[in-house]
Amino acid sequence: MNAWNTIYDQFNPIAFSLGGIEVHWYGLAYACAIVIAFYMALRMIQKDPERFPIERKEFESYFLWAELGIVLGARIGYVLIYEPNSSYYLTHFWQIFNPFDRHGNFVGIRGMSYHGGLVGFLIASYLYSRKDLKKLLIYLDLIAISLPLGYVFGRIGNFLNQELVGRVVPKDSHLGQIIGIMVDNQLRYPSQLIEAFLEGVIVFLMVLWAKKHTKTHGLLIVVYGLGYSLMRFIAEFYREPDSQMGVYFLNLSMGQILSLFMVVVSLGILLYATRHSKKIKENQ
């Protein structure tokens, strides 16, 4: 047993309290993720105006739409897919976003689905650009290159919040014994950090490579979708399935099943892009 194995004993998931409201590390990490994604996008607009011909004010307006779509979709998606008492929320819809419990205590809004957020993001992007659909693929590509590094902080937030824990490490796994984290007296994979690396860093490198080697609008979001799906599928083997969900056909988790659907959506966007997108002009 090393110091890393027992790191959860060394810190509190609550960063600080403000006026009786507990601020979690996850909330701070999520805020960092938004800021990083925002400024990464601005940098991309500045560095590559041929690929991203968007004015700053225009992007700021779009970013608000996209973020709202992500938050709404992520929360609603979690309730519909993962919440065991989802029928209650269908008749008490306002409770989905109520940060207080029935006793009036502030508990925050817990439970967000990445894939639900993805659907919300796509819907918001379409609604924002419906009057000028030529820009839809440009917006999607911009988020594809800007999101992954921000996503890293989101998963680090999950780790600090001690949630979405990993599967139990096999006793014969030497590496697992080194990197594992003690949770409920069991050594588990740090799946949140594995996801941060695979779904954040590796996917970013994939999209960055595509940016350098493709000249068609819409391909970056396709590479992101396919790359994320593959990395999430792999990472799920180290992540404990949600207790209320378990595993399904071929022992696949819900995250893996939704990732397969994400592949289908990505291929649909690829088909749309190849038919409606124009080649990007070379920089002069």
Curated annotation (Swiss-Prot):
Primary location group: membrane
Pathway annotation: Protein modification; lipoprotein biosynthesis (diacylglyceryl transfer)
Primary enzyme class: transferase
Disulphide bridges, residue numbers: none
Pfam families: LGT
Record's bilayer topology term: Multi-pass membrane protein
UniProt KW keywords: Cell inner membrane, Cell membrane, Membrane, Transferase, Transmembrane, Transmembrane helix
Subcellular localization(s) per the UniProt record: Cell inner membrane
GO cellular component, one term: plasma membrane
GO molecular function, one term: phosphatidylglycerol-prolipoprotein diacylglyceryl transferase activity
Cross-referenced InterPro entries: Lgt
E.C. code: 2.5.1.145
Tree of life domain: Bacteria
Transmembrane annotation, as ranges: 18-38, 62-82, 106-126, 136-156, 190-210, 218-238, 252-272
Binding locations of a 1,2-diacyl-sn-glycero-3-phospho-(1'-sn-glycerol): 155
Biological process according to GO: lipoprotein biosynthetic process
PANTHER family: PHOSPHATIDYLGLYCEROL--PROLIPOPROTEIN DIACYLGLYCERYL TRANSFERASE, PROLIPOPROTEIN DIACYLGLYCERYL TRANSFERASE
Functional note: Catalyzes the transfer of the diacylglyceryl group from phosphatidylglycerol to the sulfhydryl group of the N-terminal cysteine of a prolipoprotein, the first step in the formation of mature lipoproteins.
Similarity comment: family membership: Belongs to the Lgt family.
Protein name from the UniProt record: Phosphatidylglycerol--prolipoprotein diacylglyceryl transferase
Organism: Helicobacter pylori (strain G27)
Lineage of producing organism: Bacteria, Pseudomonadati, Campylobacterota, Epsilonproteobacteria, Campylobacterales
Gene name of the record: lgt
